[in-house]
Amino acid sequence: MNQLLYSKLNSLIKVEPSIATSIGKIQLDKPVMLASGILGISLDVFNRLYRSGAGAVVTKSLSTEPWEGYPNPTIFSVKGGGWINAVGLSNPGAPNFAKMIEPNQNVPIVVSLVGSIPEDFEMMIKQFKNCKVLAYELNLSCPHVAKVGLEVGDDPELVTKIVTAVKNTTAVPAIAKVGLGASNYLNTVSTAIDSGIDAITAINTVRATAIDVETQRPILSNKFGGLSGTPIKPIALRCVYEISSKYNVPIIGCGGISTWEDAVEFFLAGASAIQLGSAIGDNWIGVFDEINKGIVQYMKRKGFSTIKEMVGLAKKS
């Protein structure tokens, strides 16, 4: 059924568009997810986010053992919009976190994992054997912690070993979260796909810094952090467009998304779902429902019945 005909029928019978979406094997009732790094800390919070319209929640990146992270200051509000953070991947460790979410039966949880070697990921996944996990997101792109994140993602051989180990350890879908590092990020995408990854999240924060002109020193204790929010949206959108143009892989768009218009742009560029984080700092958790409703109204106006009909349309113009 073409779009014009559907639009006319829709106006007559008032069919509500569906915002359910699939990211390969991963099924979501709603396309807007919580990104890793913000609020992904407790089951109570996860339940509240889910009730507020999040299609899934991604946990903070978890390590094999608890990490304290960096001392304050760890976050800086950028003039004109956005944030630079260098929290240092503070987290309670995968074993402790698994015990905390074990009672969950309702919330679609994506567990974010960070490590240096394949054995790290194998060990962490085994901790969740009694948990309801929608997917694992492999953090191959944190820009401000040594020996993990981007340092792993920039090493094709290590990416191959990690993705292979994960796929051999669990039948739960695995997502590679990529970012802009020293090498071409598309090499990370290609390597992950060749190794059997189920989907790609693009992108992580972008390495950045800020300096206090009075003290004449970097503001963050770690000197460098990751830039998130509105300033990186065009970069993230470009990456999603490039990945979807070059590879046949499900994509989750992430980076600077705060409105339904942003979400639709990412769908049109090739993403099947989106994640947001910094927008919560500005709009709190009502942003999920607000974006979902905006997407539905757009779909009604344009005659779309499903998210899938929008995915990648910008590449056909």
Which residues make up each language-model segment?
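C-terminal helical cap(s) of enzyme catalytic domains, especially alpha/beta-barrels
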Residues: 69-80, 211-225, 279-304
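Conserved alpha/beta-domain cores
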Residues: 113-170, 178, 186-199, 203, ...
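Catalytic cores of alpha/beta
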Residues: 44-47, 121-127, 182-195, 245-246, ...
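Hydrophobic faces of well-ordered beta-strands that scaffold small-molecule active sites
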Residues: 32-36, 57-59, 109-113, 136-138, ...
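Glycine/Thr-rich beta-alpha phosphate-binding loop at enzyme active sites
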Residues: 82-86, 143-157, 188-245, 249
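N-terminal capping/small domains of soluble enzymes
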Residues: 1-109, 114
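Glycine-rich beta-to-alpha transition loops that act as phosphate-gripper elements at the mouths
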Residues: 37-39, 112-116, 178-184, 249-261
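Glycine-rich phosphate-binding active-site loops on the catalytic face of alpha/beta enzymes
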Residues: 59-64, 140-142, 199-209, 256-257, ...
